Amino acid sequence: LLAGIPSDPSLYDPSANPHAAILRRRHVLDLMLKQGKITQRQYARADKAELPDPNDIRLPGTQGPAPYFVNYVKDDLVARYGAGRVFGGGLKVTTTIDMKLQLKARAAIESVLRNPDGPAAALVAIDPRDGAVKAMFGGRNFRRSQFNLAAQARRQPGSAFKPIVLATAMNEGISPVTELESKPVSIDAGDRIWKVTNYDHTYLGRVSLSRAIVSSDNSVYAQLTDIVGPKAIVKTAHSLGIRSHLSPYFSIGLGSGAVSTLDMARAYATIANDGRRVDGAVFENRARVVEKVERFRSSKVDVNSPLPRQVLDEGHAELLTDILEDVVRVGTGKRAAISGRQIAGKTGTTDNYGDAWFVGYTPELVVAVWVGYPDALKPMLTEFNGEPVAGGTLPAMIWKAFMERTDEDPSRSFDSPPYQGGASTWVVRREGTWQLDNGYCRGSRLVAYFSGEGPEDEADCKPNEVSVPLVVGMTRAGAEATLEAQPLEANVAYAPAKAGRIPGLVVGQDPRSGGLSAGDPVTIWVSKAEHGMLPNFVGSGIADVQREATRLKVRLVARTGPGRKGAVLRQDPKPGVAVGRGMRVTLLVGDGSRT
């Protein structure tokens, strides 16, 4: 059986394709019999043997309660020391896993998700104080699938990502007391208009950033994403410990970037640890799963001691924790609440109910829980007692079931955030940065900044300011009409049209963007064919075309094809473009034959 598999492991996989595996085994046995390697009796016995049951196969790492964690540790070790040293023996590895918590993680998940055909779950628990991974549940059955749902699966976190957006805003000096209008919004995302609504079409009016995160308001956090910018959010996410690739699209502010459960646990652990991300001295910016590595017959020990790095202001982290406590007290995470325990956290649900999250923490433990179908993005519309699965349902229930099984000290509490006063200021985006409104700016926002924070430069807005539209690429008439509608005055200048381009279009303008006072001039450059325009040669005789080409000083390249003899059938470039001296014009000329 084993000898037949390597030629095509997928085709001859005995668990996936047992019939093909049996036929392949028989082929190998035939060869062995012909070569005298086995007797007829041995052949018959081997041919009748049952295929092994995959559930009876003991894979390396499956003997304990944490097989997915063991595999994750192996990957880290191979990346650091190489496969030869890791699998060749001689290393003694001490890990961070807490077997009691690992067993409790499985028990908590099984107590909530009782249907084997229903959604699956992933869970990661981290001690925020030293970054140690204490539990990692990556799937129900390691023998059937070695794919680690906790570390390898990448799924959208939805609103569980909003604390990272708020942390980004705090990094830029923006206070959570800043109020934005909760309403349907349309945001210019550059190549498209991003339209955002709240999932239940309920809007709160003017609301603070802190209250909006408790209510999981998409509209407000889409606007906040526009203020701080997607690139800054990606930078913050990576600094907090998320290692998955994130693209800086505007939708990232609502959790569209795919991340792992381990990613989310690390990011929240950084917040819970007063803004300090804990790396390992040996494995650096990776989840800390190894305590130390000892070598056989060597005194050298690689101690992967905690290495804290301040990546978020301590006061900002404490303020963020204070806000996230309200999510559990009065917001979408109420099912995670435990009497007498201080808990902070955030729910997350994707638009199609394909992913549901709860990431929460106490002063001693951060736990991230994901619920969904592992093999497909299947909407969970009825899996919660006939209702959709949101982050505040099954994930929050698993989180609570796990935390109630732990031996945490309930008397420990979060540090109170320091007072961070500030003032609200009108600001406007100009030239890619936020500047102070000089009193004439349109589209400005009222933003509350921490003391000593916020923009210092004043915008150069004009009285009765209007926006300068981009008219490059329009016809002269279209550009003049667009500018007049603002109202702005068009000053027309001309520029030579490039050979092969259509003349009469706007090829430049000054200014290209920004604001001007109503009636101010905008200079536009319209392309002009200085050497004439290419005529329509199709249908003309080749002799006439050659004379015109000589006059225009263009170079003809002719080839023949079926059609009226001596007549031009097709030309490239098409007529109406600007002529350039020496420009190549390709013609198809009829040779008198029929198609």
Identify the role of each PLM range.
Residues 95-116, 123-127, 136, 142-147, ...:
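A penicillin-recognizing enzyme superfamily signal
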Residues 1-8, 72-79, 126-140, 170-174, ...:
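Glycine-rich, acidic and aromatic/proline-enriched surface loops and short helix-turn segments
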Residues 188, 297-302, 343-555, 559-561, ...:
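Soluble, non-transmembrane domains of envelope/secretory-pathway proteins that act on or interact
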Residues 57-65, 174-233, 249, 268, ...:
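Conserved catalytic neighborhood of penicillin-recognizing serine enzymes
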Residues 119-120, 144-164, 176-182, 251:
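Short active-site loop at a secondary-structure junction
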Residues 9-19, 28-29, 33, 55-63, ...:
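Second-shell loop/turn segments in exported
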Residues 1-103, 137, 235-239, 243-244, ...:
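Non-catalytic, structured segments within soluble enzyme domains
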Residues 39-44, 144-147, 170-189, 228-232, ...:
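Short, well-structured active-site flanking segments
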